[in-house]
Amino acid sequence: MAAAHHTRPPLTLPQAFLVALFISPLLSGCGGDSDGNGHDTSTGKVNALGISGLSYQTASQSGKTNAYGQFQYYPGETLSLRVGDLLIAEGVPAQEWVTPLEFSPDTRAQLATPSVDDEGLSTHTITEQQLITRIPVTNLVRFLIALNWTENVREGTGIEIRNRVIQQLNAALPNLTNPIDFTVSETEFNAGGNNPSPANQLLAAICFYPEGDELCEEPPTEDAINNAPERPENDEDWDPDVDYKQDLQAKRQRILEAIRSMEEVDAEDARRYLTRELNAITTIVGNRFYLDNYIARHSDADTSIKQVQIRRIGGSAELSDVEAITTRPQDVALHSYNWQTANVEYFVAGLAGGESEIVISFAPEKTYRWVRKTLRVVIID
């Protein structure tokens, strides 16, 4: 017998509409048939909260991802993504949601095969969590986080790669000792000191402060510091037009501390960020669907076949697969489930006072993700 599945009741239709309204900023522009300018392109998005400033290219569309991380495409096209002149992904199927897990053919292929959880139902989340530990994925995500304008990507915000960062990145790319390789070990990707990794060479050439800020200047050299006069002991003897040794040392320290390094963003930071983004997409996709009932009560004398329907807010529930279990088959038994009709059939098998949960896992079309909903069935006299 399957373990009991404890969960809150699925959303009723009015609740689902409220959730849809609440998450509307995340959904802005995604999945539509139009880009809002009278064209018939579709709108996709890189991650749930977006990565802005990426250059994108499809067979027919090109541009930069906007403040929401959105891009335009026609269904069936593939997508390439760059940070300035640095290619980070190509040949990616253009679709409503694109994440770093879909940047490479290998991880894309594995996402297409769901895992099975402890209840015996298909799920994509186990596969996602396995893939986000891969070094090429974590190195790339860490690099993108390091390019965010603010030093950390706060919860509830996306990654913002500003034009100022891209301009400096493009200027520095030709001077790297080697191309950036996201497949190397974390240790090699983090290398600093006298032989910094290409990623750290690039970060050292980028100032994440407004143009003209002191922190964007070259740091005073050791020779300049050594040749500078000592600051007088008495404040009244200080000359405001003189750079004293102590001042230059402090300035050098401030500038060097402002230089970012890959060591500041570790693999756990990348996994935490990517998990948050992936879970947000799953929530958005899941909240588009609901069951036509979340609790059903049937008499123990009524053993006829019952049905629960999977529905989609604002449209038909088009599925590619569906599975279901009952947590107490001695009370409520499954009869059938069908992805084409998007329903699950069951019947009462026990006595009054018994109950069971029917746990339904289904895959909407055009996504590798699986959605889970639960129907509670109570047997009455």
Q: What are these regions, as identified by a protein language model?
A:
Residues 1-12:
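N-terminal secretory signal peptides that target proteins for export/translocation
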Residues 13-20:
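Sec-dependent signal peptide recognition
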Residues 26-29:
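C-terminal motif of bacterial Sec signal peptides marking the signal peptidase cleavage site
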Residues 33-68, 72-381:
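Feature for extracytoplasmic/surface-facing segments of secreted or surface-associated proteins
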